[in-house]
Amino acid sequence: MIKDSEFYRLDGVPITKEEIRAISVEKLNICPEDIILDIGCGSGGMTVEISKRCKFVYAVDGSKDAIDTTLKNMDKFNVKNCEVYFGDAKDLISNFKVNKAFIGGTQNIESVIEKLNEKNVRNIVINTIVLENSVKVIQILERLNFSIEVISVLISYGKRISSGHMMLSKNPITIITAKK
């Protein structure tokens, strides 16, 4: 995994943290022939990591700043097997032929998941921060007859203080893996 500090960053554009990327990439079970859709690409952390393991990546985001940041990180890490698209994922999914998808964030999550299902995407990994979004995603996936695995991950980093080391936690992330 590439260290978070190595990525180009822009205030207001999120990046999936290194440890969460590691778990999410593993849950995608990427094969060299896979073509993967990264929805809500943000800073391009997952886009870059995924691209090193698969045939091709399509990255989508509704933020121009996110698109620009992803493109800068693709350039920095010499990613050539990826195309980046600005817009609403629900309107763009029909343009892509993919077999796996990662969702790091998006509007219209129900429509997005339904469209992925219609395109026979059989492995979807979805990261959520908001508890209600996790519940909503699980309900949608169950309705569509996906097999679901749900894990909650809390990453803490050690910080040296005068009396020893203190653990500082980041936001807990729910990682939902859906398969058919």
Curated annotation (Swiss-Prot):
Enzyme class: transferase
The species this protein was found in: Methanococcus vannielii (strain ATCC 35089 / DSM 1224 / JCM 13029 / OCM 148 / SB)
GO molecular function annotation: cobalt-precorrin-6B C5-methyltransferase activity; protein methyltransferase activity
Record protein name field: Probable cobalt-precorrin-6B C(15)-methyltransferase (decarboxylating)
List of residues binding S-adenosyl-L-methionine: 16, 40-44, 61, 89
Gene encoding the protein: cbiT
Superkingdom per UniProt: Archaea
Catalyzed chemical reaction(s): Co-precorrin-6B + S-adenosyl-L-methionine = Co-precorrin-7 + S-adenosyl-L-homocysteine + CO2
Keywords: Cobalamin biosynthesis, Methyltransferase, S-adenosyl-L-methionine, Transferase
